[in-house]
């Protein structure tokens, strides 16, 4: 029997039991498609995560300060963090207090509930990339907070694209206009561009947002202490060294109580997310592999039935 005869015989066997052949192929098709889709989705998500980390910058670190005992930050002050950066300017390039909570804003008769409010310093804006260091958003109108705005606790703000559109009809019209936060009027000095990807939203960004000087935010929140600081190092390569410097200062400040603070780098956060994604991908691939195995068993079953029928 030559190859042509074997091929015709195989086609005849397939067409003899069309439903059986269809179900067999369906099992394999679903199994293979599942593996392809899962791997494609995993690679896509991985790419989006890497893109967002690159946008935020691997030279960024977050330091949480909870303090000792009753949870207060004791006598730790933002000026201590500024002094730390100044003393280690070869490794650290800046630090910003970071106060975040949801606030209610008003403009005339309009009310905006659950707007994300960020209290920061001028360091939160990277003048080289002309974007925020916590979300990579660029300005479309105006400017960001300045050193004098923060130092003098000026009632000025930078808002997101959603807020600019809904409250004022656009970014250009928003400049110089006023928004009320807890009865205090804040003048809009800048408008950020619109977020485009779900990854940016998942990273904590939102178009419904407003930036104000951090001490103003503390006053609105009714808090005394800053519990989160955002540092930047000279490069991604010096991030680990910068973290060691920050942790060393806090270790001494809190007299060896390592539960009083926590510092994490963007690289560490990315590695954690990648590890979690690896576990999820492993589970999904295992499920897809089971589908392939079931399909393979189905094929073996059909082959056995076909051979049995031919030998009778």
Each language-model region and where it sits:
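N-terminal Sec/SRP start-transfer signal
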Residues: 1-30
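Intracellular coupling helices
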Residues: 8-12, 288, 297-312
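Generic structural signal for small/hydrophobic residues in well-ordered secondary structure
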Residues: 17, 45, 63, 84, ...
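Short, strongly hydrophobic transmembrane alpha-helices
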Residues: 19-47
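Internal alpha-helical transmembrane segments of multipass membrane proteins
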Residues: 22-32, 174, 278-301
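Hydrophobic, regular-secondary-structure patches
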Residues: 42-116, 123, 147-148, 166, ...
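Mechanotransmission and gating elements of multispan inner-membrane complexes involved in transport
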Residues: 74-77, 86-91, 170-172, 180-187, ...
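Hydrophobic secondary-structure segments that place a key small or acidic residue at a functional site
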Residues: 98-99, 110-220, 224, 241
């Amino acid at each position: 029997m030559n190859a042509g005869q074997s091929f015709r015989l195989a086609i005849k066997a397939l067409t003899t039991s069309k439903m059986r052949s269809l179900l067999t192929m369906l099992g394999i098709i679903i199994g293979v498609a599942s593996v392809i889709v899962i791997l494609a989705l995993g690679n896509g998500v991985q790419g989006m995560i890497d893109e967002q980390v690159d946008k935020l910058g691997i030279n960024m670190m977050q330091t949480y300060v909870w303090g000792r005992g009753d949870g207060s930050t004791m006598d730790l002050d933002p000026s201590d963090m500024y002094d730390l950066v100044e003393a280690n300017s070869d490794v650290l390039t800046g630090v910003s207090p970071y106060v975040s909570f949801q606030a209610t804003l008003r403009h005339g008769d309009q009310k905006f509930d659950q707007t994300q409010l960020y209290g920061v310093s001028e360091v939160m804006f990277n003048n080289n990339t002309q974007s925020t260091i916590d979300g990579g958003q660029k300005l479309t109108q105006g400017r960001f907070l300045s050193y004098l705005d923060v130092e003098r606790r000026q009632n000025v703000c930078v808002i997101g694209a959603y807020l600019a559109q809904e409250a004022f009809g656009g970014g250009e019209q928003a400049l110089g206009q006023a928004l009320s936060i807890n009865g205090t009027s804040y003048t809009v000095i800048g408008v950020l561009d619109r977020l485009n990807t779900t990854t940016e939203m998942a990273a904590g960004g939102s178009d419904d947002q407003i930036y104000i000087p951090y001490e103003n935010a503390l006053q609105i929140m009714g808090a005394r202490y800053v519990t989160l600081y955002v540092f930047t190092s000279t490069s991604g390569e010096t991030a680990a060294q910068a973290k060691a410097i920050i942790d060393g200062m806090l270790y001494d400040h809190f007299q060896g109580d390592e539960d009083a603070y926590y510092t994490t780098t963007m690289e560490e956060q990315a590695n954690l997310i990648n590890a979690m994604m690896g576990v999820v991908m492993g589970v999904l691939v295992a499920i897809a592999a089971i589908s392939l195995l079931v399909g393979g068993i189905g094929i073996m079953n059909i082959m056995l039935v076909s051979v049995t029928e031919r030998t009778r």
